[in-house]
A protein has these predicted regions:
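Bacterial N-terminal signal peptides that target proteins for export
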Residues: 2-12
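C-terminal motif of bacterial Sec signal peptides marking the signal peptidase cleavage site
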Residues: 21-24
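Extracellular/periplasmic carbohydrate-active domains that bind, remodel
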Residues: 26-425
């Protein structure tokens, strides 16, 4: 992660929350325990975030004990009394943020001045579909002893969904074929009316170029580890009439924006949709969503990637502006130029006609996990007027991406953000 400034108190709190656990409000759509049942020395508010359970796994999150008589060094997770493991070791497998956090405390902030981040999540795997399980969590102390059990949290895995392979509808992962129509057909066919047990669209095995896609309620979109969803660089693939208004202002109306690469939007978007307009949407997988917004390399001929402190590659994008987008942009360039050709002033074209990676509006119960998100022409993930949102284990690689915020929550409630790695700014 890049260290370019000393964080303010609010920013430091945000960093801690995003790396560990950021809690929402009541009515958060999670399976949670009864805090009154948990001893003060036990972990509190154990919960399973909304939609985090699939047919074979689920995620547990919790808060620290209300009273700590001893130093807590870890947490132990139990299923029906059987010890599953420790949170810290589990995080090594499921949190892209943890190696960087460990490195920070071990090598950069070894003097102990900074408040340590307490990681409080655990991913449970090897479960059976459509089965209820009961879990408890204990704090582990420096001497190896454990706290009393938390209150019990019960959760049920999902039924095994029907899987629609994107290739079934003719999608080709060759990196050049335009797959917008094929992928949208797969999405449109993935409905509970067709598949009452649930449905998932799977994109796997290649680079799938596409324009704007539109999701609907009660579905999962999975991008496998061997797949990339690559945004088309053709502005026509993001038709303005299918776009959205960022705000519903009437006194000072905002210009309409083109749709993002992935969208949850009403067809006649007017700048707001109440949570519940759409419901129960999951975007998951170990694959990549690439907006194809900007050229690689800080300057012409520069390195497309750098190696960070953990030995991982970080893509390098071209910092730019309205005057330089023609030289630095890909989709950003083509969309801006197309708007200027329509007679729109260049600054306005640059500010309002670039597509983001995701615009997710009016969703009640939204879960994103595992994906690598990079190179939008405009913003990253935007969750607008939504409720019960979980972002788990995402990798955001949008540094110097010209307005490429990592995540935006607009007029939304009950957000949990944990295990995310952010290289943004």
């Amino acid at each position: 992660m890049r260290n370019t400034f000393r964080p303010s108190c609010p920013m430091l709190a945000l960093t801690i929350a995003l790396a560990g656990l950021a809690g929402g409000c009541n009515d958060s759509g999670v399976n949670r325990d009864n805090p009154a049942e948990a001893p003060a020395s036990a972990p509190q508010n154990v919960m399973v975030p909304v939609l985090s359970a699939d047919e074979n796994s689920l995620v547990l999150v919790w808060e620290k004990p209300e009273s700590e008589t001893q130093q807590v060094v870890d947490y132990a997770i139990y299923r029906q009394g059987e010890r599953l493991g420790l949170a810290r070791e589990n995080q090594n497998h499921f949190s892209p943020a943890k190696p960087y956090i460990d490195n920070f405390y071990q090598r950069i902030a070894s003097d102990g001045w900074q408040q340590p981040i307490d990681l409080r999540t655990f991913t449970v795997t090897h479960l059976q579909p459509d089965t209820e399980y009961a879990f408890t969590v204990r704090a582990v102390y420096a001497d190896g002893q454990e706290s009393p059990d938390s209150a019990v949290v019960k959760a049920q895995t999902r039924k095994t969904p029907h899987v629609i392979e994107a290739r079934t509808f003719g999608a080709k992962g060759d990196g050049t074929t335009l797959n917008t129509q094929a992928l949208q057909q797969a999405i449109d066919n993935c409905t509970v009316s067709h598949y009452p047990q649930g449905c998932k669209v799977l994109i796997s095995g290649g680079i799938f170029k596409s324009g704007a896609l539109f999701l609907h309620s009660d579905m999962t979109l999975e991008i496998a580890a061997d797949a990339t969803l690559l945004g088309s660089d053709d502005p026509a693939q993001y038709p303005l009439e299918k776009g959205y208004y960022l705000y519903p202002y009437s006194d000072h109306p905002q210009p309409r924006r083109p749709p993002s690469l992935i969208n949850v939007l009403e067809a006649d978007d007017k700048g707001e949709s109440p949570a519940g307009t759409f419901r129960n949407i999951r975007l998951v997988g170990q694959g990549t969503i690439d907006g194809n917004g900007w050229t690689r390399g800080v300057k012409s001929g520069g390195e497309a990637t750098i190696i960070d402190e953990m030995g991982n590659e970080l893509p390098q994008y071209r910092a730019s502006n309205a005057n330089k987008v023609g030289a630095d942009g890909i989709l950003a360039k083509h969309q801006t130029e197309a708007a200027i050709a329509e007679g729109i002033e260049s600054n306005s074209a640059y500010k309002n006609r670039r597509s983001s990676l995701m615009t997710l509006r009016g969703v009640h119960n939204l879960y994103l996990a595992g994906l690598t998100i990079r190179n939008p022409a405009f913003h990253g993930v935007m969750a607008l007027e939504s409720k019960n949102i979980t972002l788990n284990g995402l990798v955001h690689q949008t540094f110097d991406g010209n307005n490429a915020d990592g995540v935006e929550f607009g007029n939304s409630q009950n957000a949990l953000v944990f295990n995310n790695f952010f290289d943004t700014g």
